[in-house]
């Protein structure tokens, strides 16, 4: 590929910095090898600092690209090296923090290049800014602690202590997960309890990770639990003041364990790593994870018997906390990690590493949705047990039947939670000529409100867009093309015979959740409207998937085998 620079030969390596399409594609190509380097690097970082136990709750070690900028920085440093190796005439490289400034400057000297490194600051004192951010994080932790500790006391509602051995079901939840009748909507394992035999179903207790933004959130959820027929272990009802103090002080102490920093690209990147570690001091992520760890100690002290733990496994720090908590206080209990979703390889942490397994932060077995994912999940840890399990969240998908002779005149925009990516999708569609014979329908991510979205992306108020709230399966019969990014919706669309476009990212790498799972004849990565038009013109709108995409149905037998893992 011939690499080209635009914008007066400047290379913008900031978050959100716009790249030429050629460089954006080169960055995506490079990123596949950087994933391997990144995984190896975190192992060396952990070894250099002798990390053990709760040290693994620091986000720097997690390989989650949505929690730290390390992976993104590594990719962009390799992109810069590629530009230098291809003798591109760089005048300016723009960065946004001191760590990248030092690393880029070191690469410049290493290659004998001559360009200006521009450090785009927001003005003001960097020290004061870091201090104010630290105070803000402390204030957030105090606020969360007060809500979580005080509200259960004020409600004066006793927690329910199981009187028999239980199956612990880990999941995320919010107040809106109770319907108008008071029934709990299981968005993680739908159909599991209904499919199990009565004796097994009665042993299942939901242990939700709550999204608490206001005092009423916790109050309403606890009241909802009381009305529900399901059984719940609400962590906030079990913790005491010492647990919050423990989490508070450990959230200050643990990130400071990172002191020795290996080189990357042959240059010193200690400022990048230490800055990311500093951002984790008093962070809500590490605080919540430490509370989850202590939760298992409280359960053990109350003599709660756990037969099995099912972890909604994204290999985030909260998942690590669950694994460490179980292995510390319930060492004989088996942990089943359930990945009831399909994401791209950009989400590096979803593939466990050998050093995470040795540290005890991964489940005993990890369940995936498709046979093609088994080898992917074993890439960095061949000894990790990976199996295909029932696709609980995709039951409606497996029951879907195409509507014959339907008028497919909709381009469905299934927008992700990330606003920047959603904005790119909207902007691409606005570049399609106005005499277009298709309608653009916007389906927002469940956590994003229309009001908030229009504030962030005012372009979406254009009359060519219509917001819809119907389910994907109700929309698919009339959909000619789905436009999205790294989402399970892409897989669902292909399964239902709808072609897919993955928006090409010009500010970072582009990854498709369909790569290696679905034939590329049904999807493409697009950076411009011409690609969208070509996909519409060349794709058969009545195609059927091949057998290797089949999901495991939810049956009594498959549910029983899942619980027995």
Model-derived features: positions:
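Catalytic-core helical/loop segments in enzymes performing group transfer/polymerization on anionic/lipid-linked
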Residues: 1-565
């Amino acid at each position: 590929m011939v690499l080209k620079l635009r914008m007066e030969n400047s290379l913008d390596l900031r978050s959100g910095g716009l790249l030429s399409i050629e460089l954006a594609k080169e960055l995506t190509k490079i990123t596949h090898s950087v994933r391997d380097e990144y995984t190896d690097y975190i192992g060396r970082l952990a070894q250099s600092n002798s990390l053990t136990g709760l040290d693994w709750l620091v986000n720097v070690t997690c390989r989650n690209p949505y929690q730290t900028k390390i992976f993104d920085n590594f990719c962009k440093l390799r992109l810069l090296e590629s530009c230098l190796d291809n003798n591109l005439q760089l005048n300016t490289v723009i960065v946004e923090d001191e760590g990248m400034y030092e690393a880029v400057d070191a690469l410049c000297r290493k290659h004998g290049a001559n360009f200006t490194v521009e450090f785009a600051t927001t003005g003001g004192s960097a020290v004061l800014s870091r201090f104010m951010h630290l105070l803000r994080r402390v204030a957030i932790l105090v606020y969360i602690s007060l809500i979580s500790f005080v509200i259960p006391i004020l409600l004066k509602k006793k927690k329910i202590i199981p009187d028999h051995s239980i199956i612990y079901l880990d999941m995320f939840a919010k107040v809106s997960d109770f319907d108008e009748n008071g029934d709990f909507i299981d968005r993680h394992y739908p159909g599991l309890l209904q499919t199990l035999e009565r004796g097994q179903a009665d042993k299942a207790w939901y242990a939700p990770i709550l999204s608490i933004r206001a005092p009423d959130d916790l109050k309403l959820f606890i009241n909802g639990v009381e009305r529900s027929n399901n059984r719940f272990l609400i962590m906030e009802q079990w913790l005491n003041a010492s647990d919050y103090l423990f989490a508070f002080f450990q959230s200050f102490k643990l990130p400071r364990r990172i002191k020795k920093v290996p080189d990357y690209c042959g240059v010193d990147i200690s400022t990048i790593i230490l800055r990311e570690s500093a951002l984790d001091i008093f962070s809500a992520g590490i605080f919540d994870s430490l509370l989850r760890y202590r939760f298992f100690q409280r359960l053990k002290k109350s003599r709660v018997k756990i037969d099995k733990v099912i972890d909604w496994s994204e290999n985030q720090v909260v998942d690590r906390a669950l694994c460490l908590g179980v292995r510390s206080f319930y060492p004989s209990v088996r942990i089943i990690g359930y990945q009831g979703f399909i994401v791209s390889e950009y989400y590096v942490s979803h593939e466990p590493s050998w050093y995470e397994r040795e540290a005890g932060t991964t489940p005993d077995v990890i369940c995936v949705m498709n046979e093609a994912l088994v080898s992917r999940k074993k890439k960095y840890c061949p000894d990790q047990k990976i199996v295909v399990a029932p696709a609980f969240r995709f039951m409606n998908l497996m029951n879907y039947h195409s509507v014959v002779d339907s008028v497919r005149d909709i381009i469905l925009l299934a927008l992700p939670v990330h606003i920047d990516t959603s904005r790119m999708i909207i902007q691409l569609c606005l570049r399609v000529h106005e005499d277009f014979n298709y309608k653009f329908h916007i389906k927002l991510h469940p956590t994003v409100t229309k009001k908030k979205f229009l504030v962030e992306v005012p372009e979406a108020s254009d009359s060519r867009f219509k917001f819809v709230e119907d389910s994907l399966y109700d929309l698919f019969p009339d959909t000619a093309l789905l436009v999205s990014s790294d989402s399970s919706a892409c897989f669902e669309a292909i399964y239902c015979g709808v072609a897919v476009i993955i928006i090409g990212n010009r500010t970072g790498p582009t990854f498709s959740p369909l790569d290696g799972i679905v034939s590329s004849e049904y999807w493409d990565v697009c950076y411009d409207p011409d690609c969208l038009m070509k996909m519409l013109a060349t794709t058969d709108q009545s195609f059927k998937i091949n057998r290797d995409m089949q999901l495991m149905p939810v049956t009594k037998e498959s549910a029983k085998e899942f619980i027995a893992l």
